[in-house]
A protein has these predicted regions:
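Sec-dependent signal peptide recognition
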Residues: 1-7
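C-terminal motif of bacterial Sec signal peptides marking the signal peptidase cleavage site
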Residues: 12-14
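Extracellular/lumenal and peripheral-membrane lipid-interaction modules
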Residues: 16-458
Length: 458
């Protein structure tokens, strides 16, 4: 009878649900970690075919000139050019243009001003011509245009006439006069004055819009299909020297940007800004992002429950069954985990543990222990739960492989990096590395420092 009376209190305790007051959690987020500046290098291709056609159309197709004098040789000329076919070299344009000219001349050996203050020829003038009433005389012209990009993201050009070759000389036999040098002097002068026109037209080619499109696209959030939104937050830009693809008639330049990217599950308004003044180009490659990922505690709750829900811990004829886990928040950068359990006892208790990310990308809760309230209640209701084997089992199981999630995220980002951004604007890229390097706890979630690297192309 005494033995039965002795067991009654234990029996009554075993029927009760263990109820423990919730711990106090942090209500203020800690200062955010200062991350290294992220680098993004985006090769940009700008199609010049239609724009160079516009340049060609805008340049004069012909010009005329004359030089009249009473005594000696007077002449008038007309020059007509064929269409310009731009040849793109590595860092410049070179183009040879076929042209043709006609020349009308007259010659007076001696003038006097007796009857005319402008002078009059003492004998009848001798007239001659080249390319008039016959095929016009041929000439080959060549220009070279060096191209760079200004701090304002515009073409800056310097065009020079490099070739002027008269293929059909103009020799006037009637008065033994070789007009070739005179033609060269006059027409060449006109062609040299054309250098500035060529510069103006090429500099009017709009490359700023293409570069601004890159900047604007990086200001837009990238939807990671269920994993949140990636905000690049570009801060500065510099451009590589421009080069040209001769086959496809396009300009190629690499935009080198610095950024402060982050990932969040909550959409934030995009912040737009004008193109910044160009920074110094450092010749980087690909992209290397240090991203602050804002992840809610629910995301880890799902992973923990998937691995630990239903987990059984037997001990000396008793058993604890983990029904579910829930992260409440943190205390001094230690997670507070609410554990609902059943088995020999039923109820809840709270654990505290320090999270860390291992080099092989596992989320690990280390130094798991009961919080103070749990210790106090369990000492009175279920002292046997203090056995170190229970915490050892929980510590051993509190390790979660992030690699499947990271690989899935990597594939999602890769898909987003290979998509159409706008009409005629396509983004392509790869993700070579995605890894979490550190973790910090906030009031409602984690701040994960994530390193992402790969290549981009527009």
């Amino acid at each position: 009878m005494k033995y039965i009376l002795f067991l009654l209190p234990l029996f009554s305790w075993s029927c009760k649900t263990i109820d423990i007051p919730e711990p106090i959690v942090e209500l203020v987020d800690p200062p955010m970690p200062i991350l290294p500046v992220s680098q993004i290098n985006v090769p940009i291709e700008i199609d010049l075919q239609s724009q160079l056609k516009d340049v060609e159309k805008s340049l004069p197709k012909s010009f005329e000139g004359k030089q009249e004098q009473c005594e000696g040789v007077s002449f008038a000329y007309k020059f007509i050019r064929e269409p310009i076919h731009f040849q793109l070299k590595k860092t410049s344009f070179y183009y040879e243009v076929d042209g043709k000219f006609e020349l009308k001349l007259n010659y007076c050996p001696k003038c006097h001003s007796l009857w005319d203050e402008n002078g009059s020829c003492t004998v009848p003038r001798i007239y001659a011509s080249c390319g008039v009433g016959e095929p016009m005389r041929r000439v080959k012209v060549g220009y070279n245009t060096n191209v760079s990009i200004t701090d304002s993201y515009l073409f800056n050009t310097e065009t020079k006439l490099q070739l002027f070759d008269v293929l059909d000389p103009c020799e006037i036999t009637v008065f033994k006069y070789d007009a070739t040098s005179q033609v060269e002097k006059q027409v060449k002068g006109q062609l040299q004055s054309l250098e500035k026109d060529i510069d103006r037209q090429i500099e009017s080619v709009d490359i700023r819009s293409s570069i601004k499109d890159v900047w604007r696209q990086l200001e837009e959030p990238m939807d990671l299909s269920g994993y949140g939104l990636l905000y690049f937050k570009p801060k500065s830009m510099s451009l590589s020297p421009v080069t040209f693809d001769a086959v496809n008639k396009r300009a190629e330049v690499t935009a080198e940007l610095t950024a402060e990217p982050f990932i969040t599950t909550n959409r934030e308004p995009a912040v737009y800004s004008d193109l910044p003044k160009q920074a110094k180009y450092t010749k980087g490659q690909g992209y290397a992002l240090n991203i602050l990922v804002k992840a809610s505690y629910d995301s880890i709750n799902k992973i923990m429950n998937k691995d630990l829900m239903g987990y059984k811990i037997p001990f000396n004829g008793k058993e604890i069954v983990v029904d579910s886990l829930h992260i409440l928040g943190n205390q001094e950068q230690k997670l507070i985990i609410q554990v609902y359990f059943s088995g020999s006892k039923k109820g809840e208790f709270f654990l505290v543990g320090t999270p860390l990310i291992t080099d092989d990308q596992f989320f690990v809760l280390t130094n798991l222990a009961y919080d103070l309230n749990s210790k106090s209640v369990l000492l009175k209701t279920a002292k046997w739960m203090f056995d170190k084997r229970i915490l050892e089992e929980l510590n051993k199981s509190a390790k979660y492989d992030l690699n499947p999630l990271l690989n899935e995220t990597k594939n999602t980002i890769t898909q987003q990096l290979n998509s159409k951004l706008d009409d005629g604007v396509f983004l392509s890229g790869t993700v070579d590395r995605l890894a979490v390097s550190s973790i910090q706890l906030g009031t409602s979630g984690f701040f994960l420092t994530t390193e992402v690297s790969g290549n981009l192309k527009l």
